[in-house]
Amino acid sequence: MLPVQTSNLAAAFTDAVRALAPADATLPAVTFERPKVAAHGDLACNVAMQVARALKSNPRELAQRIVAAVEADARAQGLVAGMDIAGPGFINLRLTPSAKADVLRAVLNEGDHYGARERGVHGQVLVEFVSANPTGPLHVGHGRQAALGDALANLLSWQGWHVHREFYYNDAGVQIQTLALSVQARARGLKPGDASWPEAAYNGDYIADIAADFLAGKTVSASDGEPVTASGNVEDIDSIRKFAVTYLRNEQDIDLQAFGVKFDRYYLESSLYSDGRVDAAVQSLIDKGKTYESEGALWLRTTDDGDDKDRVMKKSDGTYTYFVPDVAYHTTKWERGFTKVINVQGSDHHGTIARVRAGLQGLDIGIPQGYPDYVLHKMVTVMKNGEEVKISKRAGSYVTVRDLIEWSNGGDETIRGCLEQGVADWPAHFTRGRDAVRFFLLSRKADTEFVFDVDLALKQNDENPVYYVQYAHARICSIFESWGGADWESRLAELAGADLSAVTGADASAQALALGRRLAEFPDMLAAAAAELAPHAVAFYLRDLAGDFHAFYNADRVLVDDEAVKRARLALLAATRQVLRNGLAVIGVSAPRRM
């Protein structure tokens, strides 16, 4: 339903229940859902069963009294055609044809804004995602983060938040020093397995590429930094470190550009040390009595905030543990005015959540418990040519985001080749691959493991979910081209005034009504997905919407001789096309007119 329809109907039900309840009773929020069986109606409500025990009433009898009150409520007039009570007390509702027509007209009139809320109604939110160490290319796990984080940011923006996208670079610590030593070893002509090869060094071929460019005196730059020119001096480890980090940040920038992901800010971990923020946070925790010394180390009393044991902050060698700069970093988020923060990270970060939150609580600067929110995702396995693509950290072999985009794009074109040839619009060459990777990585809940099947991503049939959804959009465009010629989009406005009874009234087919119901669910689906930090729900919805469209297409001819019926069905298709476009936009996938 439209938000105003939902609001009016929920208010009518709420008042009906409140009139039957004691004045001090706590009542649940009234919600509506789609009945499992279409013949049962358009909406179902179980509020009678929810409050029956508190009101000491039989739920079915209570449902009858609620129905009687709602039927007499002016807010339900013109909205509800009838209500039935099923089972122990379910209330099934049938909406009026005019209410259904109002939804279609709203889609056509609101266009690209259908389902969106006014910007700023919720304030601002910071979404941190990807946040890969600049020690290697973006792998498929980072790709899942990018798809989840960007779609979540889009979703929150649609729901009225001012969204700030941030990428946190762990450009300090042991891993960065290991990167520098690995490049230095390659620059000296060493290879993995040689006696002098550094312990725990990175073994991937990309290390040799960095070393070659360093020796050649190449210049590289990241999107938010100054160009860095290699000195070529293999003894200058600081120069190697700076060049290697910038080189890999540039490579990650290329991958993100191909993936269609942009950030508002890149925040460097190293700046937290140079600005003194890490030391200041630790000193503040010491001053507030949140730490103690034991076994030569400094410990944080994380058990005070629910952790299973206290955690080391500063090791006996004087270095900080992994979560300490994270505490300092999150204080900057709070100080910048972001009272709502969401971190999208791999499930391997689960252990740091309690530590970071405990550190923030220990600072006692007004940060609420449970800050920040987290969306954790599980691993991705890649299948290609019917076999699992094996990865090995020791050998330095893994599937990158770039690999997935190129493989899913079809053909032999590569991103590196386009860059070397100076192709200006090179990201557009990989739209198909980008769309497939984005949609696939959102097609499961974040907390479930996912198998990315490259062979499936290349299929052009209804087995491929992104093809199935995009083809629905392209098929609708084809119908409109047959109706209105090449300039058909300019004629869509005339459909907003069409008589819609052929797709909303008593003579409408079951498929037309089902499609209309699905379109009506879009705003509420977006709101629920945003509230639950669940962008996968948008991908699920789009597959269902495409299925409803294909069922309608197979049941009802659109371009019939009866002008009124034709215009009504075209209006339904125009609304369907619009919602497909809007939903795909939320998850960052294109809506092609031809396929």
UniProtKB/Swiss-Prot annotation:
A motif ('HIGH' region) lies at residues 132-142. GO terms for biological process: arginyl-tRNA aminoacylation. It holds the Pfam family Arg_tRNA_synt_N. NCBIfam families: argS. It comes from Cupriavidus taiwanensis (strain DSM 17343 / BCRC 17206 / CCUG 44338 / CIP 107171 / LMG 19424 / R1) (Ralstonia taiwanensis (strain LMG 19424)). This is Arginine--tRNA ligase. Keywords: Aminoacyl-tRNA synthetase, ATP-binding, Cytoplasm, Ligase, Nucleotide-binding, Protein biosynthesis. GO terms for molecular function: arginine-tRNA ligase activity; ATP binding. Monomer. The gene is argS. InterPro entries: aa-tRNA-synth_I_CS, Arg-tRNA-ligase, Arg-tRNA-synth_N, Arg-tRNA-synth_N_sf, ArgRS_core, DALR_anticod-bd, Rossmann-like_a/b/a_fold, tRNAsynth_Ia_anticodon-bd. It is found in: Cytoplasm. GO terms for cellular component: cytoplasm. Belongs to the class-I aminoacyl-tRNA synthetase family. The keyword Thylakoid does not apply. The lineage of its organism: Bacteria, Pseudomonadati, Pseudomonadota, Betaproteobacteria, Burkholderiales. Its EC number is 6.1.1.19. Gene3D superfamilies: Arginyl tRNA synthetase N-terminal domain, HUPs, Isoleucyl-tRNA Synthetase, Domain 1.
